[in-house]
Amino acid sequence: MRILILLLAVTQLAVSSPVITRCFHGGQLIAERKSQTSISEFCIKDDVSMLKSEIVYTKNDTGIFGHSKVFRHWTITDWKACNPVVTAGGSINVIEVDKNLNLVTRNYVCTGDCTITVDRKNAQIIFQTDKLNHFEVTGTTISTGWFKSKASVTLDRTCEHIKVSCGKKTLQFHACFKQHMSCVRFLHRSILPGSMAISICQNIELIIITILALCIFIIMIILTKTYICYVLIPVFMPIAFAYGWAYNRSCKKCTCCGLAYHPFTNCGSYCVCGSKFETSDRMRMHRESGLCQGFKSLRVARRLCKSKGSSLIISILLSVLILSFVTPIEGTLTNYPTDQKYTLDEIADVLQAKTHEDSTKYYIILYTSLFGAGLTIIFAGVALGLTIILEVLTKINVIFCNECNMYHSKKSIKYVGDFTNKCGFCTCGLLEDPEGVVVHKAKKSCTYSYQINWVRGIMIFVAFLFVIQNTIIMVAAEEDCWKNEELKEDCVGPLIAPKDCTDKDHKTYLSEASLLATAKKITQVDAENVEILGKTMESAIRVIERQKTYHRMHLLEAVFLNKHCDYYKMFEHNSGYSQVKWRMMIKTQHFDICALQANSPFCAQCIADNSCAQGSWEFDTHMNSTYSSKVDNFKHDFSLFLRIFEAAFPGTAYVHLLTNIKEKKPYQAVSMIEKIKKKFPNNKLLIGYLDFGKYLLGLSHASTYELQQRQLDKLYQPTELTRSGGQQTSLANSVVGQATKECKKYKDVSCLSPRFGIPLEDLISCCDQPNYNIYKKPKKVYKAHDKEETWCINDQHCLVDFVPAEADTVEKLKPMKCWLVDPGKNDDVYSIAIKTCRVVDKGVCTVNSQKWNIIKCDSGPLYYSDHIPGEDTGNDIGHYCVSAGCKTDRYPINPDVVTDCVWEFTSRKSQYIGKISMQSLEDYEKALTDRLTHTLETYSFAPLENLPHIKPVYKYITAQGVENSDGIEGAFITASIPAAGGTSIGYNVRSKDGFPLLDLIVFVKSAVIKSTYNHIYDTGPTISINTKHDEHCTGQCPSNIEHEANWLTFSQERTSRWGCEEFGCLAVNTGCVFGSCQDVIRPETKVYRKAVDEVVILTVCITYPGHTFCTEINAIEPKITEEIELQFKTVDTKTLPYIVAVNNHKLYSGQINDLGTFGQMCGNVQKTNSSILGTGTPKFDYTCHGASRKDIIVRRCYNNNFDSCKLLKEETQLIFNDDHDTITVYNTNHLIGELAIKLILGDIQYKLFTETLDLQIDAKCVGCPDCFESYSCNFQIVSNIDTICSLEGPCDTFHNRISIKAMQQNYAVKLSCQKDPRPSGTFKICNREYTVVFHTVAKDDKIEINVGDQTSFIKEKDDRCKTWLCRVRDEGISVIFEPIKAFFGSYFSIFFYIIVVVVVGFLIIYIFMPMFMKLKEVLKANEKLYLQEIKQK
């Protein structure tokens, strides 16, 4: 009883305990399958869910089966709310399961509407949506996440090259701050607030130079406490000497001590010579008595070495000197004859090609040398000979009448005494003038019409001779062969070959067959098939030998010999390309009889040395006895003879020989051999070989010789011209069909030519007899799903027209034997209807000029759909109904009829920042005042958009041209500029006499080296492994393990043992576990390969006040226009990497596998479309279970070195436009070279200009102080004369000279203002002042946005100011006092002026007053001397 209670308690405990499951509990079943091959268990996570597999094994009479199930658990529960679709390059990675339970990774995007904006003031990217959506930011800043209303990402790098994705939108842009942000990021991570960090970093150079000066000063103070400080004596000695020299000559002496005047201090104890005195009187006496040795410079130098003031000065100078040669931290950029063997079949073609090549080269040289002389001789001979011949021929038609001095036609002429009935009428058309006013003079031109007729007739006759020449030659010897129904010995190839061979190189198989068709020997259908002979003699001979009927073989052989008309003509000699094969066989393969009867004359001369000089042979009785006793030797020699004969005479001759042997009448072939011998009597080796063949054919063994199967295949197999299926029907009344999309009673038409059996197919018939409509046969036809006895092309919707047959084709088939065959049924995707599918794309397409709603399923087909967006079947994510409510079956539409599709779900393509140029300043002001900081466009004032952000440094340049009394005619300037993006130079153009003419700015807007790359594959880390495995209880592993394409196989034997066997398996140390595997990767990195070579493009802009233009130039050719001439003086291009990788919108280069290569480096697992490629040796393990199948654990399948991708070099100097399928890579930071510029200025009549005049000016300026845009001004200037004037403004103007023309009124000027010019400012134009209204827009943009191919403000600033000292100069000392002044206001000015007064007073009292007093004493001394001189006089 106690045992029973215990068992019940254990059972209850087991029932109440929850079942422990792997990975997660529950989940949605998305796929299952029963199969003898099982998958491995897995637990894997993607961006929106987790997946796991479960396998349960069952056994029945047919074997052990695994029931595999795959479950999904959603981690983003409402992920479907974003309406996801599969999109290449999508930001959401989802793992799906196909019908074979293989894991497949796909990229999705949400299709919900998402708005992407850029807040330039706060340097943020803002995303807004109405429902669940997903965003991703990649590039220099990386961020991703889900949101339902609003999200933002802050930018904090100096220059951001990023790709922003949200929903279906993808935006790519380049954003740069006004200052470098590395310092701000470093300080902002500390306790400092953001505003303070920005203020510190704006003046970082000044702060650092101050800190460096203090550090050096502290070190100097420490050194002054030691003797080391005296190493500076050489530095201070020149200063001390100069001070001593000035001390003795420039300073007034104190009346008490004799030293330099010191009004505010007591007299000292030390003299300048170093002596010490107790009282000032003794020192004065020492000075006045001349005992003082003078100023001691070394003593002063030693004091300076110990002085703190000198240490401070040296520290400041050293810090300035050091940092003047150092690039600012903010501006630094961190960079991290063939040897070939031929077969005997190919050697004829190779030899002929070599011979033809050598002959061609010889004749080219020969004809080129004789061309000039030959033309002269030919033309002279033709001119002379043609004239004589035409005169003779003309006399046949025309006579010259001496009575009337005219030419008369002989036709219908009658003589009347010495006159004719045509006297008075000449062949030239002139009548005799009865009055004698016009006197006809006989000329040769009177007979020109007859001469022209004769020339026309001669040309037609010559052309006719050329046409019939080959026809006569070709058909003369073959007159009877075309009529034969079987092969005769007179019609074999060597005997019907042309005797003459001309114009061989211009002959083609088709042209020769056309001549036969013209001669009515064959039909045109036969002639059109001769191109099956191919392009080489080897292929042609093989095609001829494969023919199974005499007519076909004879036809092809005749065409072949007519084209290669010298093929058998070479047999008249002892060499030639057509004899190489059989001669090589004789040389390399020997008859057995010659080994047994080596002394035989035939063997000694023909076989041993290939001379065969004797010419006739008698085969002795020794050969007879040998062959009679040794049948095997006869079979060998006879077989070798046949092979050599086939190599020498392929085609009909060889078939004729084999036919006689097969019919046991080999002796009947002797007459054919005799005729061949007579045709080629000079070919000694051939004669000897044929004589030996005659001898073999005459032996008794030849009648019993059995042909081999290969030889039997060469024989003809005549068959009746018929077809295996279909009904024979006469198509004599058939007609060409009319264009139609539906074919009633469709039948396939198959015809044979009546004589040679050449098939005429690829035709169909529609309608009933006898007037069949004939059409060209389409590739595939389908029976319409909604109409009886109606057939359609390509699909079941009848959307494509049947193409009518050609009229001449219909005429050809009328005399032929034809059969009508019922069409076969096409069981493919176009005959299968569906209700649901996984939709890839949905949109509107044009189908036969009509707009249809089309969807594209993941299996590939297109369907017409009235699908309601968002209607999901619920099976799994991505499955949608094809028809509304899944009520109607739909058949696929062939994509050939679908055009102009506008897909709603497209692959992700990047958008770029738009550029809008405003022609009107009012429109530009509106764009700025509307605070369009969140828009994805940039606005610019068109006349000034080609200027740099920062005013360039101006240089003086002299205008060249022709000087005249008014100025310069055809003025121009020449200069050179570095070909680097962002480079700008201003030019003050002056005349040769120094008169300022105008200002212009040359700006290299962009200088790029670019190339296009194509996407070749994706790679990434392995996140799972697809496996399929099976096991055998006993036996060995299969030699060939079945596996899918691109899967690797694995196996292990002796896996069955006690406690480790499947159901019903009792085995030890035997059995096998085997299977296949494939990696599943997360496609994180895209790999691209260069498609085109690099292109260098330079955009140069020229801007005058009132006129601007840009032009592009490449590195290959100069650019010349009416306004400018550009040419590269030097070019230094840079090669872009051949293969690059893109990960998180960053570009990498290095050791990357190309498509199809799998080295141990980045990219050795490659995903292309839906295929995964890779190599490796799988490593697997298994876990044993008693009476159950083993669990297979695949630890590695492919060799995946994705970690090496993380070690690739990031190409920070390169930017790119990413469109997924292609990328365009730009190098915008390379100095391409030096560019020479010539600007055409036109005529400048500056000597007639006036500098001072009154103008009617209406002006307005719009902009913001200390911002990216600065101020843009538009001047409406009305003037009656042309002049050039100076231009000054309240801020720094980009142009200081303006050319005013009477025919132009609009002028644009850009100003750079650090402060607000207030409501109005004063411009000075032509020495007259004008008040201009300023419209200041309150803007505090922190970032500047563009597409990245043009230079930014920060880059121009770095290029302009490349040292610390330059930055300190630009920042100025005033930045230290700016915060104080802003706090105290006007009181700070009062304090500042007091400090200035104190400093100036100090300088006057201690420096200038002693010097003035000394000057006063010198003047008084001179006055005393003057008075003394007067008294003495």
Swiss-Prot record:
Question: Keyword Transmembrane on this protein?
Answer: yes
Q: Which UniProt keywords apply?
A: Fusion of virus membrane with host endosomal membrane, Fusion of virus membrane with host membrane, Glycoprotein, Host endoplasmic reticulum, Host Golgi apparatus, Host membrane, Host-virus interaction, Membrane, Signal, Transmembrane, Transmembrane helix, Viral attachment to host cell, Viral penetration into host cytoplasm, Virion, Virus entry into host cell
Any one annotated GO CC term: membrane
**Glycosylation site positions:** N60, N624, N1169
Q: Which stretches face the Cytoplasmic side?
A: 225-308, 391-456, 1409-1433
**Which residue ranges does UniProt annotate as crossing the membrane?**
204-224, 309-329, 370-390, 457-477, 1388-1408
Q: Which domain of life is it from?
A: Viruses
Residue ranges, Lumenal compartment?
A: 17-203, 330-369, 478-1387
Q: Which GO terms describe its biological process?
A: fusion of virus membrane with host endosome membrane; symbiont entry into host cell; symbiont-mediated perturbation of host process; virion attachment to host cell
Q: Which residues form the signal peptide?
A: 1-16
Q: Name one Pfam family in it.
A: Bunya_G2
| Site keyed Cleavage: positions | A477, E478
Reported modifications of this chain? Specific enzymatic cleavages in vivo yield mature proteins including nonstructural protein NSm, Glycoprotein C, and Glycoprotein N.
| Task of the protein | Glycoprotein N and Glycoprotein C interact with each other and are present at the surface of the virion. They are able to attach the virion to a cell receptor and to promote fusion of membranes after endocytosis of the virion.
- Give the UniProt family note: Belongs to the orthobunyavirus envelope glycoprotein family.
| Subunit structure comment from the entry | Glycoprotein N and Glycoprotein C interact with each other.
In Swiss-Prot or TrEMBL terms, this protein is called Envelopment polyprotein
Annotated source species: Bunyamwera virus (BUNV)
Q: Which gene encodes it?
A: GP
